[in-house]
Amino acid sequence: MQSLHGNCLIAYARHKYILTMVNGEYRYFNGGDLVFADASQIRVDKCVENFVFVSRDTLSLFLPMLKEEALNLHAHKKVSSLLVHHCSRDIPVFQEVAQLSQNKNLRYAEMLRKRALIFALLSVFLEDEHFIPLLLNVLQPNMRTRVCTVINNNIAHEWTLARIASELLMSPSLLKKKLREEETSYSQLLTECRMQRALQLIVIHGFSIKRVAVSCGYHSVSYFIYVFRNYYGMTPTEYQERSAQRLSNRDSAASIVAQGNFYGTDRSAEGIRL
């Protein structure tokens, strides 16, 4: 028997299928049923290929993608330990996710693909009103995660401790206390979220420094540059230049390798002709 606290599982029934709960109860499913469940409440003793276990880390990455209203649901709310969504068509990606999940030595690209496919499977349940309460019951996100989720949903907003507390349905003093217990503060998390978003906008999207500053909630470009330098140890412009240089070096290296492969193939061909 396998029981994983703080994790979830997704099961897919291609034919009639029976799940055994830890309390001994049997749950019956028809072919095409996709199941999302608290892994700690399921006995898994056979047909593991029908399951995809979703770790706490993966769930924590999925949670910030949701709207902050989701966090206003009380995690202690009593909900079912599993949900069922009937799919009218086969889910071809499920088998791929299951295979990737059983491989302990995934390449980086495979890890990213597995995560993306798991997110796609989780999204099937988003319209179920019990999905988010169940997710929160299982994950029980810490206050850092909940605050960052609120901030990231509107990164440019003029966030204050009181405003964030209001979004989380608690008093500012209680929020401050809970963050202190996790050895952080709302201002520290606000800076972390904005700096991480700034890096994405600079490196991936190539925004101008002024546009990045405004997009991240800074009215003063000079102050944004000051915060960025304190956080990353260099100015945004310096970071842009270094990123461009690294990209250029990688392109050059790739070009050299490609040329080497070409000439190597050409010489081999000449050798054959001789």
UniProtKB/Swiss-Prot annotation:
A Pfam short name: HTH_18
Keyword Transcription regulation applies: yes
InterPro entries documented for this protein: Homeodomain-like_sf (IPR009057), HTH_AraC (IPR018060), HTH_AraC-typ_CS (IPR018062), Tscrpt_reg_AraC-type_HTH (IPR020449)
Description of what induces expression: Expression can be activated by RpoS and repressed by CRP, H-NS and GadW, depending on the conditions.
GO MF term list: cis-regulatory region sequence-specific DNA binding; DNA-binding transcription activator activity; DNA-binding transcription factor activity; protein homodimerization activity; transcription cis-regulatory region binding
DNA-binding region: 162-183, 209-232
Keyword set, alphabetical order: Activator, DNA-binding, Repressor, Transcription, Transcription regulation
GO terms for biological process, alphabetical: DNA damage response; DNA-templated transcription; positive regulation of DNA-templated transcription
Transcription recorded as keyword: yes
Residue ranges of domain HTH araC/xylS-type in the record: 145-242
More info: GadX and GadW are part of a complex system required for acid resistance via the regulation of gadA and gadBC. Many of the described circuits use mutants missing one of the network components. In the wild-type situation, however, many of the scenarios are not easily observed.
Listed PANTHER family: HTH-TYPE TRANSCRIPTIONAL REGULATOR GADX
Function text: Positively regulates the expression of about fifteen genes involved in acid resistance such as gadA, gadB and gadC. Depending on the conditions (growth phase and medium), can repress gadW.
Assembly mode: Homodimer.
Protein name: HTH-type transcriptional regulator GadX
